[in-house]
From Swiss-Prot:
There is a cross-link at residues 61, 73, 100, 245 (Glycyl lysine isopeptide (Lys-Gly) (interchain with G-Cter in SUMO2)). Residues 56-72, 385-398 have a biased composition (Basic and acidic residues). This is Zinc finger protein Aiolos. It comes from Bos taurus. PROSITE patterns: ZINC_FINGER_C2H2_1, ZINC_FINGER_C2H2_2. It is found in: Nucleus; Cytoplasm. Residues 10-20 have a biased composition (Polar residues). The modification Phosphothreonine is found at residues 20, 326.
């Protein structure tokens, strides 16, 4: 076996030094190969261990012979199917070479269609480049080569990793040129810039209301379609809605929207029905004839505006300061003007000469015909926009107040009630709307207390602020339309359930 290696080296050296002997070199190679095979077969001893060495030598000679063949051949290969070289690989190498060739042809045909795109062999997705295809295949394999060295989060693309790193560094490269807002993503800055724009490109074709975002418009359209289907008005309702929108001022609409959102955010200021404590006893005789029967008996818009302003002052005017100026507290100069509008119940110490009997003698009871005008003082939100009606209301109110000058509340025993000093909002609130001979609310001490009634819901309130908040929930022109979200109820039961459940919160923008 030792004689084989020198012969192989000698043969290779001779082949390199004599490149001009063409056919003789190939013949010598065949004879030498046959001679070496006979020597290997006839060699005694551990011949199996040296078979690998013989194979390596054959590979080396194959490579050299291929080089010499290329050098000696002057003409290029014309036909690949009929090669002129009488040399071929052994059977074992041909088997593997065929497998590689088949794989190459199949992958080339499937991933390289005629359009130039590459297809995913798993789902068939077409990609424009090889890099895009590799990123897509990571979604099938689950490979995430880009990993954060701080928290260990992995990503399929480098851009996502760079965006994630900004969370750790706190970098906010995208800044608003109008305010101090800064963010990490460009799309977030684009959405923020819409808040500075005055225009509202997304407009509802049903009612004409406009929004800055498409999502807000879609939510509004669902409610608007529901409204049109429930009322069954169709195109007529759309025209009326546009007319109402034109009548209502933009400033007033902004105030109401801010007020509704503020009420929704404050759970403590949500309108609540007065149930009453157990120690209070009620002596109520309700007369259904006091309900409004005509639209001309509804309250004028001046009282409605006052109720809204009182609710705004109670809920907090900081959020509404750019739109509404909170009226200041009444001073000594304003009290005479307010007293001419509303009678102020004075205590015994404030009465002249401390004699309430003189005032009681001056009290003139009103006939039954004046009851509808008293009910007109209820600060409801169902206003009738008519100048003639407003002037008639004012004339009747002045006539009533002149005949009813500052009567203190009295108990059953005929003694006047002692009250604490009037608070700031007590000077502006109207007198109780319910006639004392029809509805009386008596506390545990047997004293008659002031009561405020919502004629739409038939609910009594002992607190004027809660009464004002409740009346602010009624719609302007339809008392059973929610002033927060626009939901229209069929009766007072559905309206009360809607307010109690707070369904309007999900409808707010």
């Amino acid at each position: 076996m030792e004689d084989i290696k020198p012969n192989v080296e000698l043969k290779s050296t001779q082949e390199q030094s004599v490149p001009t002997e063409g056919s003789e070199l190939l013949n010598d190679y065949d004879l030498t190969k046959a001679h070496e095979t006979e020597n290997v077969d006839g060699t005694e001893g551990p011949a199996n261990e040296d078979e690998d060495i013989g194979d390596d030598s054959m590979k080396v000679k194959d490579e050299y012979s291929e080089r010499d063949e290329n050098v000696l051949k002057p003409e290029p290969m014309g036909n690949a199917e009929e090669p002129e070289i009488p040399y071929s690989y052994s059977r074992e190498y041909n088997e593997y070479e065929n497998i590689k060739l088949e794989r190459h042809v199949v992958s080339y045909d499937s991933s390289r269609p005629t359009s130039g795109k590459m297809n995913c062999d798993v789902c068939g997705l077409s990609c424009i480049s090889f890099n895009v295809l590799m990123v897509h295949k990571r979604s099938h394999t689950g490979e995430r080569p880009f990993q954060c060295n701080q928290c260990g989060a992995s990503f399929t693309q480098k851009g996502n990793l760079l965006r994630h790193i900004k969370l750790h560094t706190g970098e906010k490269p995208f800044k608003c040129h109008l305010c101090n807002y800064a963010c990490q993503r460009r799309d977030a800055l684009t959405g923020h810039l819409r808040t500075h724009s005055v225009e509202k490109p997304y407009k509802c074709e049903f009612c004409g209301r406009s929004y800055k975002q498409r999502s807000s418009l879609e939510e509004h359209k669902e409610r608007c379609r529901t409204f049109l289907q429930s009322t069954d008005l169709g195109e007529t309702a759309s025209v009326e809605a546009r007319h109402i929108k034109a009548e209502m001022g933009s400033e007033r609409a902004l105030v109401l929207d801010r007020l509704a959102s503020n009420v929704a955010k404050r759970k403590s200021s949500m309108p609540q029905k007065f149930i009453g404590e157990k120690r209070h006893c009620f002596d109520v005789s309700y007369n259904p004839s006091y309900m409004y029967e005509k639209e001309s008996e509804m309250i004028q818009t001046r009282m409605m505006d006052q109720a809204i302003n009182n609710a705004i002052s109670y809920l907090g005017a900081e959020a509404l300061r750019p739109l509404v100026q909170t009226p200041p507290a009444p001073t000594s100069e304003m009290v005479p003007v307010i007293s001419s509008m509303y009678p102020i119940a004075l205590t015994r110490a404030e009465m002249p000469n401390g004699a309430p009997q003189e005032l009681e003698k001056k009290n003139i009871h009103l006939p039954e015909k004046s009851l509808p005008s008293e009910r007109g003082l209820s600060p409801t939100n169902s206003g009738h926009d008519s100048t003639d009606t407003d002037s008639n209301h004012e004339e009747r109110q002045n006539h009533i107040y002149q005949q009813n000058p500052m009567v203190p509340p009295r108990a059953r025993n005929g003694m006047p009630l002692l009250k604490e000093g009037p608070r700031s909002y007590d000077l502006l609130k109207p007198p109780p709307i319910c006639p004392r001979d029809s509805i009386k609310v008596i506390n545990k001490e047997g004293e008659v207390t002031d009561v405020y009634r919502c004629d739409h819901c038939r609910v009594l309130f002992l607190d004027y602020v809660m009464f004002t908040i409740h009346m602010g929930c009624h719609g302007f022109r339809d008392p059973f339309e929610c002033n927060m979200c626009g939901y229209r109820s069929h009766d007072r039961y559905e309206f009360s359930s809607h307010i109690a459940r707070g369904e309007h919160r999900a409808m707010l923008k």
